Amino acid sequence: MEEDKTFQSIRISENNNNNNNNNNNNNNNNNNNLNNNNDNDYDYDSINNIEEKFENVSKELEGQSIKFREIDGGKNNNNHDIELGERKPENEEDFKLRQYFEDSQRQKMLINHKPKKMGVSIKNLTVVGQGADNSVIVDNSTPFKALGKLLNPFNYFKKDKNKINTFNILNDINAFIEDGKMLLVLGRPGAGCSTLLRVIANQRESYISVDGDVTYGNIAASDWSKYRGETLYTGEEDIHHPTLTVRETLDFTLKLKTPGNRLPEESKRNFRTKIYELLVSMYGLVNQGDTMVGNEFVRGLSGGERKRITITEAMVSGSSITCWDCSTRGLDAASAYDYAKSLRIMSDTLDKTTIASFYQASDSIYNLFDKVIVLDKGRCIYFGPIGLAKQYFLDLGFDCEPRKSTPDFLTGITNPQERIVKVGFEGRVPETSVDLEDAWKKSQLFQSMKHAQLEYEKQVEQQKPSVDFKEQVLNEKSRTTSKNSEYSSSFYAQTIALTQRQLSLTWGDKFTLTSRFLTILVLSFIFGGIYFQQPLTTDGLFTRGGAIFTSIIFNCILTQGELHGALSGRRILQKHKSYALYRPSAYFVSQILIDIPFILVQVFLHSFIVYFMYGFEYRADKFFIFCFTLVGVSLSSASLFRGFANFTPSLFTAQNLMNFVFIFEVNYFGYSQTPDKMHSWFKWTYYINPLAYAFKSLMINEFKGLDFSCLDSAIPFDHFNNSTYSDMSHRICAVPGSIEGSLSVKGENYLWDALQINSDHRALNVVVIFLFWLFYIGLNLFAVEYFDWTSGGYTHKVYKRGKAPKLNDVEEERNQNQIVKKATDNMKDTLKMRGGLFSWKSISYTVPVAGTNKLLLDDIMGWIKPGQMTALMGSSGAGKTTLLDVLAKRKTMGTVTGESLLNGKQLEIDFERITGYVEQMDVHNPGLTVREALRFSAKLRQEPWVPLKDKYQYVEHVLEMMEMKHLGDALIGTLETGVGISVEERKRLTIGVELVAKPQILFLDEPTSGLDAQSSYNIIKFIRKLADAGMPLVCTIHQPSSVLFEHFDRILLLARGGKTVYFGDIGDKSKTLTSYFERHGVRPCTESENPAEYILEATGAGIHGKTDVNWPEAWKQSSEYQNVVNELDLLRTKEELGKYILDSDLQVDGKQAPPREFANGFLTQFIEVYKRLNIIYYRDVFYTMGSFAQSAVSGLVIGFTFYDLKNSSSDQQQRIFMSWEAMILGVLLIYLVLPMFFIQKEYFKRDTASKYYSWHAFSLSMIAVEIPYVVLSSTLFFIATYWTSGIDSTASANFYYWLMHTMFSVYIVSFAQALGAACVNIAISIAALPIVLFYLFLLCGVQIPPPAMSSFYQDWLYHLNPAKYFLEGLITTVLKPIEVLCTDVDLIKFTAPSGTDCQTYSAPFLQQATGYVVPLSNTTNECGYCIYSSGSDYFETSLGWDYGHRWRNFGIIVAYWGSSILAVLFFVYLTQKPRR
């Protein structure tokens, strides 16, 4: 009974407290419509359109019905919802939104629509993760250590050899939330908030174990997996296709989530249109419908607008339970509140259960929720009504600062540096997370909530909401969707929608399409020119095969870009899979459907050019079979390469696997090595190679039915006396398939004798190619359905060996708290700043848009002085980041006008180096640890005369002050892989990297974005101490609490269009600031109100904010503006400057040091960058060990393919092809090096913007760091290939072969880097790469001998090809010592006339030809001709190569390497600045 009374009192207290917690907030929005400016994410001219659309949607659906709301008239005289508590009155847009949802719900009930009312109950939930001490940074030594453990017999007797240390991410959590209610999850980063939301959303794959019960209504978690998509987890990252527009993004989701039981006579299209217009109006995206979403690399929506798209997409998905994880990141305070209100309205009207974690939630947002749970290091320290949470902790002995919001107070309890203990409670309040959890579990409130949870579960068992829920889920499915399907739409509908989206993505990427088709045109004409009009003679037999080989390989290589495309789309695919939008297999099918038309076009374009230029037979059936076969090659190759991406976790793993398979495809193609020469151990790959079947098919297609003349080349011959061999019956064509006495060779005979190709199997071979395609499709469908290589945003930390901290250990927690406290107390002693006075006047910025200039900043002026902290505010899209970019000299596009001065002088070349810029995007090199990143910044940006020991000591101080001491040896990693530090920790690292440079001025762009309230408070407090130490700062901030806002001295407030609303002092308790707005007719700001929210509301910020005042114009007419103008003029005088910069200018020996662009000289830069790159490469096992494995494996494959070559003439041809294929290693390295270069180039652009190091230091370091890895790769390839193939093993030949091959590999790698430096992105470089590769391979003299080339190619392109000199050196070295001894199979057999012997008959012939003739029998006149007598015969007669040119050729390759180094330097210099 006592518990029942307590429970009842909780409910009453909850409602009353909701009504009284923030009494002074009632009037916060009373004047929402008083003022108007342009500070929104859309034009104010569209407000009337938005209202009209709302009105149209509402009227059409409601039919002027009366709005119904539950009002508690007894206890609340203010007519506010009981469940909402005391909160701001709804404005007009909120009212219309609520009205729309209520009326649509009412009409749906008329058609038997069942509500999906599903609450959530969590009992004894414990989530276990892997301990950090098990997670050691992987490097190149890791495989060897693992192999050592495997080979160590003693390891097999250890009892705990497989033991994994674990820790509890969540510990014994109990909570519940009813349907239609909202639960707020609060906690610092690392508290387990995201894990709790993921587990509620039934995403459990990332954890070792999940114990306890989570029930959805009366459905257990194990059964809830059938309803994937009914619980949604929306993370803080915005993951979208950047090239799709807002309309395309949302319409795609609507297509797949349109319910089957719509209102009568409402079509799918009408439903989608209404919902789309409602949501874009609701989130202020009406005018952005045709704007690309964009990302950090593609221009599109602003950060705030992109966040709204993420929110809108999740809302469209129609889940009954939605988990929002910090979804307000990047939104200003007004927009965040508007978003939270929309959640409240949908929870009320649609019975949605909403569970959300918020960073920096205001009281206005807090009061929208029903319950709150507070977590600390995975332990629940409070769960219950929002109205009782604050009092609970006050009763424990904690105190709350004035104007501090309740959410900030609650999460501040978990931070020893933040919380305040009441007088008299010292030593009595709980200290650690364990203490706080114990206090909670011993409280009466805990028992009451436990009782309330039991009552809720009983109610659920009685009402059985699952019955209506399951019925409605079935009703929402389309008619063609299986009842057992997790999806709302059928597989067919999914495929159609995905195909339309894929078409938009493919067709929208005009740049890549243009690059691809340009490559096809260029190379097709080059191929046609090289193999132009092949003669119908035996001289054209081999080159015809070369032309076919080239076309097949070309169409195969063209599709290799699909690997990168499949990898880049993974995260979007997995997000949509969790939303239950579509099956991954439907996504893959859509890619295939779009592949077909584009591949048809590219194949027919290529075929139309080359087929007729090759001089192939002019027959329509043969032409179309040629095209059809190449279509099969392209389709099967595209699916194969996508398969490598779908079956592997990373780019470099997929690339290595693709290269490995590609080696087999080329070697066992049937061209460079005929089937009869293949060894049994690898010959089976010939039969599973689709390219081999394509080669056979096209060879049959071309050769069948043709006769090839050998009139001029039949042996024996005498070019000086034609009558010598006038008897044609004793002559024969010198090719396989020939018959003595016939001066032509049938194509069918040649195919069988030379290549073992049955000319009757053309159709069969084509069918096999397409069967391979279907097989690859099946493999991919399996992979995309059952493999998920993304982390889903969950991050797992890895550390240097032995450096991992103890997790959730009480003693370790106390130690960390002491370290942070000590560092904070000593901060002033640690920080010694040398600030400057920075001013700007009449700053305007325009960018070219669609042929006109768009003004983004308009006449901005202001200053920052030493010791002052200036806030830069405005709604999303007002131009805050743009202004910071301009002030920090980061803009490389557009036109900037106006004047910026540092200490009264024009900005010097060192400005970017001596200023710190904390950018909004957290860009860090993932291969470094936190400490290494900070030390790198300190070493290269602090002054060179500062001792290294002092720089490192300062780094340690910053680590302590930023609360990152325990993360110093943690790998930064990436969010995509899930290995590394979290989003919040990356933000702190971004700030730390700038602080360790000891800048004179600090620009900070959203330093608290993505941080919790306590971390934000710590950051701002830390920045305040920097200002107090003499550093001038300007900081953009979106959602400052009143406590944070009080740390600033001045504010620059911007309106939409980059116009100034106010610049000046904030004043004590913000009186100076608020009085300015009050003088212009805005209501007074109350004592309990957040001034930051007040000014945003006054200026019409937020999604639907309005104002009647033209604030930019009001500013220009104010006395404050004139004061700013006068002050700027005053700051130019020496007298005024002397007040601020007495010690700020650097002096050396009494003289002012000249400004330096970089702090250190070139040699120091090169050494430090090279050392950093070595660390990164050493830790990138997939890249380095992958390249080693690839070199060894490809070498073994080639070596055993050409195993133990003898001295026959056919084996000489095999030696040539073996040397030709030695270039393959270079090609494989290109495909590995290009992605790595682009990755490092992106980090270089970020570093060079802050003047860490120069472009030539980066270029030369990138070249140098690759050299040892390339040398080792080449050596492994040489060892695996050289002796297995039976090449001359003399020391000189060995050394030359290794040296030449290594030098060529080094050159190829630097050439790949030059290509990467020249191209804007990797897609362009991949598109351009085939031109380079085919130039190297086709015009080197092997596939088509120089005499067979046209003069255009032979006279200059052939001689410019570095591969020509490489192969001349290798082949002449390999063939020079060989004495050719033909086998019986290699001999070309003919008979001498009666009365003569073989030697006599062939004597005139041998005087003009290479080789020798031997009698085959003592009793007959049968002779055998061996085409070569020595290895020199081939390269001297056919190629015109000279053994004496070996070292000349080596020198030429070195020269090519030098030219590629110059190319890298040149192109890096041209592209060093990012486009922004």
Swiss-Prot record:
Q: What SMART domains does the entry give?
A: AAA (SM00382)
Q: Where in the cell is it found?
A: Membrane
Q: Which GO terms describe its biological process?
A: aggregation involved in sorocarp development; sorocarp morphogenesis
Where is composition skewed (Low complexity) in this entry?
15-39
- The UniProt annotation puts the region (Disordered) at 13-45, 68-91
Per the record, membrane topology reads: Multi-pass membrane protein
Q: Where is the ABC transmembrane type-2 domain?
A: 507-751, 1182-1405
Q: Which residues form a coiled coil?
A: 14-67
Membrane-spanning ranges: 517-537, 547-567, 592-612, 623-643, 764-784, 1182-1202, 1219-1239, 1260-1280, 1298-1318, 1322-1342, 1450-1470
- Residues forming the ABC transporter domain are 151-402, 838-1082
Residues annotated as binding ATP are: 874-881
Keywords from UniProt, A to Z, are: ATP-binding, Coiled coil, Membrane, Nucleotide-binding, Repeat, Transmembrane, Transmembrane helix, Transport
What Gene3D superfamilies does the record point to?
A: P-loop containing nucleotide triphosphate hydrolases
Q: What is the similarity comment for this entry?
A: Belongs to the ABC transporter superfamily. ABCG family. PDR (TC 3.A.1.205) subfamily.
Name of the protein this chain belongs to: ABC transporter G family member 17
What species is given as this protein's source? Dictyostelium discoideum (Social amoeba)
Q: Upper lineage ranks?
A: Eukaryota, Amoebozoa, Evosea, Eumycetozoa, Dictyostelia
Gene from which the chain derives: abcG17-1
